[in-house]
Amino acid sequence: MAPSSQLEFNVVRKQPELLPPAEPTPFEWKELSDIDDQDGLRLHISGFFIYPPSTMSNVGRDNVARDIRLGLSKAMVFYYPLAGRIREGPNRKLSVECTGEGIMYCEADADVRLEQFGDIGALSMPFPFMDKVMFETVDDGILGTPLMYFQSTRFICGGIVIAGCYNHAIADGLGFYMFMAAAAQLARGAASPTPLPVWQRERLLSRVPPRVTFIHHEYIHDTPKTETANPLDNEPWPLHSIFFTRVDVAALRAQLPGHLRKSATSFEIISACLWRCRTAALRFAPDELSRLIIAVNARTKFGPPLPQGYYGNSIMLPMVVSEAGKLVLSGLGYAVELVIEAKGKVTEEYVKSVADYLVLNGRPHYVVTNTYLVSDLRQLVEMSKFDWGWGKPAYVGPADVGENAISFLATLKNGEEEGVVVPIRLPESAVGRFKSEVSKMVSFGCLEDVKPNRDGYLSRM
């Protein structure tokens, strides 16, 4: 069998169609929140749903497309702003015009079996079939264009991949998966989705008058004199996936001081390890600033909390900063303390201060210079929620990390061993250094790239 990265296969797409809501929906204008319309969210984000052939054996090819169309069109009745188009007003303020036009959908067929890419339950980034199962003609802009694009690709084994691409200004990742879970529920015959969607974007608008009460390093674009152009920026940054076992995490935990050894979470430990090792591998100057952003869900930080059905952007991006030399030369506990500090910043007042800062400063992009952003997706989705009547998917999550400086933690079963997989982009010249840095920090062997072995399971190289 040819290695999956070299596998040649074809995908034949049908004519894309504009899929409207199943019923007429209200025509109105809805203002997005001041968190939604920041510059860093004005882009498209993709997600994969991989259904192995074992769940699809009794499902006809036409039935799959029927179920997807039905579920998506019914879900848009409840999530009707998603069938509209985003417009920009004065001061770059975004609103959605609820036009009821709909979203884009395309069917496709692949002349290959899913298992030819390795064990389906252990597939991880980079997905070798990604480009061919994504909707082919996603508009570059976010204004006046469909808010979602979907392609369902049927493989000759009967397996299917649903690839979605959504406008990040209208929803965060949790909101997107909420919509997809609703579509699956409605396709199975539910009268309405649980939870029901809630708009309430006014709860994340800036105050009148705005008052910034925190220092928001994540949006302050000052460039210290010690930061210089990094020649690595001119190299390709291919995507790798690394796998942390429970033993690896335990080895890292053992290095922490006593007060952190029991209290630090696996996310805090892994994020700190990755930040430190990435900084060393990229060879920042000792006095250069290395930045870490931790994505924090603020839904529960409000009093009362945002409703369960809230699908707008509520992920905060608190940043901590360290001189690279201190970060690399200090023990792991130093980096873990900073991760905990970042997470602890997010309160209701912090969220309001972010909205105020964004409005006062032209809705800027978060700082990307020497920045690494980490998110925890392990609790984001429950596989059972995405059963369209065919069974649970083997994978639910992003199709790619997008930018060079973003990683997320996801649960993965590597053969018989369950652990945490983390996709990360690195310049080729830094990959060896990164692996070396991580191997120094774990007492169990050497952490390497995740790749399928001859049995299809993920293994260290």
From Swiss-Prot:
It is found in: Cytoplasm. It holds the Pfam family Transferase. The active site is at H168 (proton acceptor), D387 (proton acceptor). Pathway: Aromatic compound metabolism. GO terms for molecular function: piperidine N-piperoyltransferase activity. It catalyses: piperidine + (E,E)-piperoyl-CoA = piperine + CoA + H(+); pyrrolidine + (E,E)-piperoyl-CoA = piperyline + CoA + H(+); (E,E)-piperoyl-CoA + 2-methylpropan-1-amine = (E,E)-piperlonguminine + CoA + H(+). The keyword Secreted does not apply. The keyword Membrane does not apply. Confined to immature fruits perisperm. Also detectable in roots. GO terms for biological process: piperine biosynthetic process. GO terms for cellular component: cytoplasm. It comes from the Eukaryota. This is Piperine synthase.
